[in-house]
C-alpha cells in the first residue's frame, strides 16, 4: 500500500475539553452526640463544610483539606468515608454539579470560623432540630447520608455506595 492509499486518520483534538461538570466534596461532620456541624452563611442559609476537589487530589484528601480550611478541624483523609455521589444542575443548566458526600466522625480541634467572608459561625446541630433554610446542596448531602431526615432537597440523582456510614443511633 502506498502512502497515498493509506486511510487518513483524523487528528484528535488535543485541547482540554470544555468543562461540563464541577466536582466537590460535601462533608457531614458528626460529634459523639450524633449532631452535625453546620455553618451560617452571610446570606442566612446553613451549610455543611465542603468545596471543590483539586486536580490530583482524592475525594478524601479534598474533604479533609476543606474541613481544616473552613472549620479548623483536622481529620486524617483515612478517616473520611465517601458514602454517595450526587448529581444536580442547581447552579447552572449548562453545568452538572457532582458532589461526593463524605462523613467524618474522627477529628481533632474545635470548630472555628476560618473564612469569615463565607461563614459567620459553626454550630453543632441535633438532627431533629436542623436550622432553616438549609443550602440545598447541603440538604441533598444530609438526605443522602440519612434518608430518614425530613428535608426538602430538590431534584438530584443519588448514587449511594454499598458500604456507607450510618447516622448515629441507627444500629449496626
Question: Where does each model-flagged region fall?
Answer:
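Structural detector for helix-capping/boundary residues
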Residues: 25, 51, 65, 78, ...
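A short coil-to-beta-strand element that immediately follows conserved catalytic motifs
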Residues: 74-84
Amino acid at each position: 500500500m502506498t502512502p497515498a492509499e493509506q486511510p487518513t486518520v483524523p487528528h484528535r483534538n488535543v485541547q482540554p475539553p470544555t468543562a461540563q461538570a464541577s466536582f466537590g466534596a460535601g462533608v457531614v461532620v458528626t460529634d459523639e452526640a450524633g449532631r452535625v456541624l453546620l455553618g451560617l452563611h452571610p446570606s442566612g442559609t446553613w451549610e455543611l463544610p465542603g468545596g471543590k476537589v483539586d486536580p490530583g487530589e482524592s475525594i478524601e484528601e479534598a474533604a479533609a483539606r476543606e474541613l481544616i480550611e473552613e472549620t479548623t478541624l483536622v481529620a486524617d483523609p483515612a478517616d473520611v468515608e465517601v458514602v454517595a455521589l450526587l448529581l444536580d444542575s442547581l447552579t447552572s443548566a449548562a453545568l452538572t454539579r457532582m458532589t461526593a458526600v463524605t462523613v467524618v466522625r474522627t477529628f481533632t480541634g474545635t470548630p472555628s470560623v476560618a473564612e469569615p467572608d463565607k461563614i459567620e459561625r459553626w454550630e453543632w446541630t441535633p438532627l431533629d432540630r436542623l436550622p432553616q433554610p438549609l443550602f440545598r446542596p447541603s440538604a441533598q448531602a444530609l438526605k443522602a447520608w440519612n434518608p430518614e431526615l425530613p428535608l426538602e432537597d430538590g431534584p438530584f440523582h443519588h448514587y449511594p455506595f454499598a458500604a456507607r456510614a450510618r447516622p448515629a443511633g441507627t444500629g449496626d
